[in-house]
């Protein structure tokens, strides 16, 4: 059958040209953008890191490490692209256990997810399936601390700024916001304490705690793990984001800050070395545009 003599073939060709070829072109653009983003990420300065390994001082149950779900590659549920390829990158990340870190999932939203609503269920189900422990990212201070049931959170002497309330943000910190949409500026003697709970599975304890901040001067941080083991940190001044990483079975962590001038606090991440970590980034009234501000 000649193509020009068959309306069905012409229609099929037109469908192929306008659908599959366009989809292939779109995937090339996405892959190109991904490679570009990876190159940009590699060119950024690495966050300065201090580690504290105290696992032998704080005995606890063995961490839940990553296990690949049975049939993960065959039983993928297509969500948007209606193709089993849609979740390939996620599954590759899950099976790349040698990376030494969990697969991190950020859930951004407005008041609909405040207090870990929805994300608590998502985190629990993913950690049931894929392993991992910990509640993920928690700001040093938050106006929602009393309403969040997935972590016991107390703090004092912090000034909290929300990217949605730009009129209230001092000019000196307008360019310091984190993806969470909050920054926390400490006063002298500021404190923060987080403690795991049994309200949900897998969040009573984690294998790692990360303190994320920028220390432009000479702030001192006294960190206490499980109300028993303490250490004073004096990170070097830097304009870049810094981390203090505590490798231990962490049920609770307390932080006290002194010489706080020039310190910008973001938060503490409680997670494991494998599995899945789900971060809740809720900003009341956020339409999604806060990411671009």
PLM region spans:
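Hydrophobic membrane-insertion alpha-helices, especially the h-region
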Residues: 1-2, 260
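Proteins with a high burden of low-complexity, intrinsically disordered sequence enriched in S/T/G/P/A and R
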Residues: 2-9, 34-38, 73, 87-88, ...
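Juxtamembrane proline-rich low-complexity "stalk" or linker regions positioned immediately after a signal peptide
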Residues: 2-59
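Long, contiguous interaction/targeting segments characteristic
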Residues: 38-75, 80-149
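Short N-terminal or domain-adjacent regulatory/targeting segments
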Residues: 75-97, 177-198, 229-232
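Conserved SGNH/GDSL esterase-like catalytic core that processes O-acyl groups on lipids
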Residues: 104, 114-218, 223-224, 233-293
């Amino acid at each position: 059958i000649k193509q020009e003599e068959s309306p069905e073939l012409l229609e099929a060709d037109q469908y192929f040209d306008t659908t599959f070829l366009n989809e292939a072109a779109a995937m090339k653009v996405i892959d190109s953008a991904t490679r570009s983003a990876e190159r940009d990420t590699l060119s950024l300065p690495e966050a300065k890191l201090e580690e504290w390994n105290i696992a032998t001082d704080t005995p606890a149950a063995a961490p839940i490490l990553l296990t690949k779900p049975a049939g993960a590659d065959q039983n993928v549920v297509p969500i948007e692209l209606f193709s089993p390829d849609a979740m390939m990158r996620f599954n590759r990340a899950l099976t790349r256990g040698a990376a030494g870190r969990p697969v991190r999932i950020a859930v951004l939203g407005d008041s609909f997810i405040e207090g870990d609503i929805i994300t608590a269920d998502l985190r629990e189900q993913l950690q049931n399936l894929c392993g991992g422990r910990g509640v993920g990212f928690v700001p040093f201070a938050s106006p929602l601390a009393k309403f969040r049931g997935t972590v016991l959170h107390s703090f004092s002497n912090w000034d909290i700024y929300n990217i949605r309330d730009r009129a209230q943000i001092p000019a000196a910190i307008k360019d310091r916001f984190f993806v969470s949409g909050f920054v926390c500026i400490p006063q002298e003697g500021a404190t923060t304490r987080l403690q795991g709970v049994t309200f949900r599975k897998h969040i009573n304890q984690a294998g790692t705690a990360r303190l994320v901040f920028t220390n432009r001067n000479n702030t001192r941080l006294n960190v206490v793990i499980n109300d028993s083991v303490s250490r004073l940190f004096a990170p070097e001044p830097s304009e870049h984001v810094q981390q203090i990483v505590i490798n231990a079975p962490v049920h609770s962590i307390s932080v006290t800050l002194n010489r706080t001038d020039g310190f910008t606090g973001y938060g503490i991440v409680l997670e494991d070395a494998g599995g899945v970590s789900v971060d809740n980034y809720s900003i009341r009234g956020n339409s999604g545009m806060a990411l671009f501000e």
